[in-house]
């Protein structure tokens, strides 16, 4: 078989073909019937597709490269609270996952949709669902914001444009926060209305949130430390009626992504106190 002549036109055709869609070098070799060294040389200056891109060509691997939208700000917050980054046994492939209660499964579906991820939601048999995507690029971007393997010991509030910080806080709140607004009977048979917003997490993260709320809303609450298993965590509580109202107004202002059950409790709180 005569040796194929590699013209400049053929080289450009091969480059264009490779860039037309995610594919392996082997696929290019087979199409043009050229050796691996030849194809590698022709494509040496072209960025290669990652394993994640090959397996899931439509996925937005660069979703967290820059925090510049409600969607990536909110899911960054949710990952800070309820996310996990881990490597496979080889240490070369990173995965990013979020685990939520089954009643919040729709948020896992939303995450899947915004990433265009071709993956399924898994279930642990204990009332939780999980979505996991493989991407070294995404893991590297998230590391810039403190979402790293074993992050539970090191989380903090990252520096991002202030216009997106409330979306991040809402994501953290939906993951590791709680809101209470309900009547509770007293010993005399009458009801009192309980209300509270709280965050739990590392002392650094709670201090960061406390400082942010002080700077932006003049809140004076400080986190308290408590022992949890083999480590210490902190809790930040907001119990003043006006502060809870102001907090809710800010985290839900213009929001389209949030856990419905927590937002409903905030609406119940507003209704009980006739707050507008």
Functional labels for PLM-detected ranges:
Residues 1-276:
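Internal intein/HINT superfamily modules and their associated LAGLIDADG
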């Amino acid at each position: 078989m005569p040796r194929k002549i590699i013209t400049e036109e053929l080289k450009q055709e091969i480059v264009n073909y490779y860039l037309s869609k995610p594919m392996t070098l082997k696929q290019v070799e087979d199409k043009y019937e050229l050796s691996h060294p030849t194809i590698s040389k022709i494509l040496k200056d072209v960025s290669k597709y990652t394993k994640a891109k090959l397996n899931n060509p439509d996925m937005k691997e660069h979703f967290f490269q820059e925090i510049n939208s409600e969607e990536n700000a909110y899911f960054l917050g949710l990952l800070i609270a309820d996310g996990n980054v881990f490597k496979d046994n080889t240490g070369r492939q990173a995965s990013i996952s979020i685990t939520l209660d089954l009643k919040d499964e729709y948020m896992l579906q939303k995450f899947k949709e915004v990433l265009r991820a071709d993956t399924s939601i898994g279930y642990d048999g204990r009332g939780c669902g999980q979505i996991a995507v493989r991407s070294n690029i995404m893991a590297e971007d998230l590391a810039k914001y403190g979402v790293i393997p074993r992050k539970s010991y090191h989380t903090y509030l990252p520096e991002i444009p202030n216009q997106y910080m409330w979306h991040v806080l809402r994501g953290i709140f939906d993951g590791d926060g709680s809101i209470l607004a309900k009547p509770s009977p007293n010993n005399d048979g009458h009801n009192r209305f309980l209300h509270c917003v709280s965050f739990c997490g590392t002392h650094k993260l709670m201090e960061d949130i406390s400082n942010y709320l002080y700077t932006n809303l003049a809140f004076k609450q400080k986190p308290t430390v408590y022992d949890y298993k083999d480590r210490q965590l902190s809790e930040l509580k907001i119990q003043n009626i006006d502060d809870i109202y102001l907090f809710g107004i800010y985290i839900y202002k213009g929001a389209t992504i949030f856990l419905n059950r927590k937002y409903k409790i905030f609406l119940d709180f507003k209704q009980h106190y006739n707050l507008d």
